Amino acid sequence: MALENLLHPTNIKIDEYAKNATKFSFEALERGVGYTLGFALKQTMLYSIAGACVTSIKINDGKVTSLEDVIPCDETVADIILNVKSLPVTLAEGVETGTITFELSGSEEEIFSEEAKLSEGLAITEEVFICSYNGGKKLKIEAKVEKGVGFRPAQDNFKDGEFLLDATFSPVVFCDFEIKDARVGRRTDLDKLELNIKTNGNVNCEEALRLAATKIQNQLRNILDIEEINKGIFVEDPTKDINPILLKHVEELNLTARSSNCLKAVNIRLIGELVQKTENELLKAPNFGKKSLTEIKDKLSELGLSLGTLIENWPQDL
């Protein structure tokens, strides 16, 4: 079959069946194309769209240190953490972090997200119930908001007066797809792709789908121009003069899970990226302590490497 004769979806349906929830259907597609597109779009929406979320919570300036502590609310500490964590938040362009603060005193009342004090560039996009305040004693709740991509696990449950939270940054909270049979004329060997998307309201489902499709398109752009490739254009390997050990992934150092997660949190993937960091730079990374530093130095030493190494002509786009 000629490439120009391959089917493209001409029947596209959009069913917004609930708030922030939409089902898209595309037909007809060549057999197998439905699964390929569905899987790529799902993974991209869940793990590659940037967003913001609450990453840590401090109660009464860090004096509340346990989920069992008593606070002047009908809810438990765990309830409040879950309610604050569920806040759908956005950060303005150029703003990487923000703070949400609730300062409660006086008579009893029900507290909602609209009563929060927000740092500049931070917004809460939907009203969320926080707690039923019993009055009397003061209660202060502070939440840190960060931008990010994908999922970042908390390295500790509690540190420096803060409850640390697993961070799910994507505004897409659910995405799945189903492939059904489709028919065009006499052809019955075709796919129908049904894509089910739910978001937290920070972006609508159509925008999430559009962002994912654009990201996939950008990833493929460098291999789309077959004509240029056929001209035999030679691109010099930017890594040809670099020690092959430096191009290996840090996983090959066999670090402990804690040290590995610390490096992932600051996007250090290759040994070459790691050795160019100084001790002070690593110690500034979230949850990175001297024990992890010692372990990394020992592992690098076994390979004849050390931190603070300058690598000339290190490619920035590996």
Curated annotation (Swiss-Prot):
Q: Which UniProt keywords apply?
A: DNA-directed RNA polymerase, Nucleotidyltransferase, Transcription, Transferase
Q: Where is this region: Alpha C-terminal domain (alpha-CTD)?
A: 242-318
Chain positions covered by the region annotation Alpha N-terminal domain (alpha-NTD):
1-227
- Extract the GO molecular function terms from the UniProt entry: DNA binding; DNA-directed RNA polymerase activity; protein dimerization activity
Q: What is its EC number?
A: 2.7.7.6
Biological process GO annotation list?
DNA-templated transcription
Superkingdom field: Bacteria
Gene Ontology terms: cellular component: cytoplasm; DNA-directed RNA polymerase complex
SUPFAM superfamilies annotated for this entry? C-terminal domain of RNA polymerase alpha subunit, Insert subdomain of RNA polymerase alpha subunit, RBP11-like subunits of RNA polymerase
What family is it from?
Belongs to the RNA polymerase alpha chain family.
User: What this chain does, per the record?
Assistant: DNA-dependent RNA polymerase catalyzes the transcription of DNA into RNA using the four ribonucleoside triphosphates as substrates.
Which NCBIfam families does this entry report, sorted A to Z? Answer: PRK05182.1-2
HAMAP family, per database record? RNApol_bact_RpoA (MF_00059)
Its assembly, as annotated, is: Homodimer. The RNAP catalytic core consists of 2 alpha, 1 beta, 1 beta' and 1 omega subunit. When a sigma factor is associated with the core the holoenzyme is formed, which can initiate transcription.
What's the name of the protein?
DNA-directed RNA polymerase subunit alpha 2
What organism, scientifically named, is this protein from? Answer: Francisella tularensis subsp. tularensis (strain SCHU S4 / Schu 4)
